[in-house]
Amino acid sequence: MDRAQKQELVTTLTDVFKSTSVVVVAHYSGLTVAQLSRLRRQMKASGATVKVAKNRLAKIALEGSDVAHVSSLLKGPTLIAYSSDPVAAPKVAVDFAKTNDKFVILGGAMGTTALNVDGVKALATLPSLDELRAKLVGLIQAPATKIAQVTTAPAAKLARVFGAYAKQDEAA
């Protein structure tokens, strides 16, 4: 990499660290290209991104950002996963780590909060933003559905009573 490419990478990473809501740092030593490609595809499918950058360049990009404390984790072959959804990157990383022993989560950050391995795993157990929105819509719609059922129930009961009387009259 020449100097211009390094500056461009640092600028890109700086923008990422300032705009992202969650960052996960992990060791990937020993993973095959196919496994790393699968991780990238899974991250992309969930709305997250994986970057492998030189630790020194990543540390420069982290300076002055909310997640600057993550720089202490950048030792050895590390990758950085990030997403705007606070649950997407941790969830994919934890699921991937369960199936690949060589993928080791070191920690991360959410906003200005530093996360250890347990913190990243705890984030992974939370429902995603889309799941929370769906639950909220369901909770909002539930009272309206109940009201509709309550208002139509007497009419339905009355119709069944009339139907029973009609059958009784036909039988007689």
Curated annotation (Swiss-Prot):
Gene3D superfamilies: 3.30.70.1730, 6.10.250.290. One of its GO terms (biological process) is translation. It comes from the Bacteria. It holds the Pfam family Ribosomal_L10. Coiled coil: none annotated. Disulfide bonds: none annotated. Keywords: Ribonucleoprotein, Ribosomal protein, RNA-binding, rRNA-binding. GO terms for cellular component: large ribosomal subunit. GO terms for molecular function: large ribosomal subunit rRNA binding; structural constituent of ribosome. InterPro entries: Ribosomal_uL10 (IPR001790), Ribosomal_uL10-like_sf (IPR043141), Ribosomal_uL10_bac (IPR022973), Ribosomal_uL10_bac_type (IPR047865), Ribosomal_uL10_CS_bac (IPR002363). Belongs to the universal ribosomal protein uL10 family. HAMAP family: Ribosomal_uL10. Part of the ribosomal stalk of the 50S ribosomal subunit. The N-terminus interacts with L11 and the large rRNA to form the base of the stalk. The C-terminus forms an elongated spine to which L12 dimers bind in a sequential fashion forming a multimeric L10(L12)X complex. PANTHER family: 39S RIBOSOMAL PROTEIN L10, MITOCHONDRIAL. Forms part of the ribosomal stalk, playing a central role in the interaction of the ribosome with GTP-bound translation factors. This is Large ribosomal subunit protein uL10. The gene is rplJ.
